[in-house]
Amino acid sequence: MNAKALYKKKALRDRRKLRIKSKLLGDALRPRVSVFRSNRYFYAQAIDDVKQSTITHIDGRKMGFKNTQEDAKKLGALFAEELKKAGIERAVYDRNGYLYHGVVAAFAESLRENGIAL
């Protein structure tokens, strides 16, 4: 990809991100689960938007997981356990401008399978 195409791709993601965030709001009972995926790793965090604080997070890089669908499912199961320890059973899923496909979708499905209502 040339520089112009990369710029357009990032600009489109930023527009999606703003559109999504304007509609989502998390609180202590139903936090916002925000995900970030790089080319190599996957990260997620549960955010209380009222207090502007992170409740819990998971770091795929520190745990040795790569940015694959299988690893996203494993991370989803581990993150669901962390959320349950924090007393959270419902959340709002913030895909952070990424398309709901592949790793982002696998992580969300894994959270649902492990008892977190999104």
Swiss-Prot record:
Entry superkingdom: Bacteria
UniProt-recorded Gene Ontology molecular function terms: 5S rRNA binding; structural constituent of ribosome
InterPro entries reported for this sequence: Ribosomal_uL18_bac-type, Ribosomal_uL18_bac/euk
SUPFAM superfamilies (alphabetical): Translational machinery components
GO CC annotations, alphabetized: cytosolic large ribosomal subunit
One GO term of the biological process aspect: translation
Keyword entries, A-Z: Ribonucleoprotein, Ribosomal protein, RNA-binding, rRNA-binding
Record keyword Ribosomal protein present: yes
Pfam families the record matches: Ribosomal_L18p (PF00861)
Subunit structure: Part of the 50S ribosomal subunit; part of the 5S rRNA/L5/L18/L25 subcomplex. Contacts the 5S and 23S rRNAs.
Function: This is one of the proteins that bind and probably mediate the attachment of the 5S RNA into the large ribosomal subunit, where it forms part of the central protuberance.
Family: Belongs to the universal ribosomal protein uL18 family.
Record NCBIfam families: L18_bact
Family annotation (HAMAP family): Ribosomal_uL18_B (MF_01337_B)
Protein name: Large ribosomal subunit protein uL18
Organism of derivation: Helicobacter pylori (strain G27)
Organismal lineage: Bacteria, Pseudomonadati, Campylobacterota, Epsilonproteobacteria, Campylobacterales
Gene from which this protein is expressed: rplR
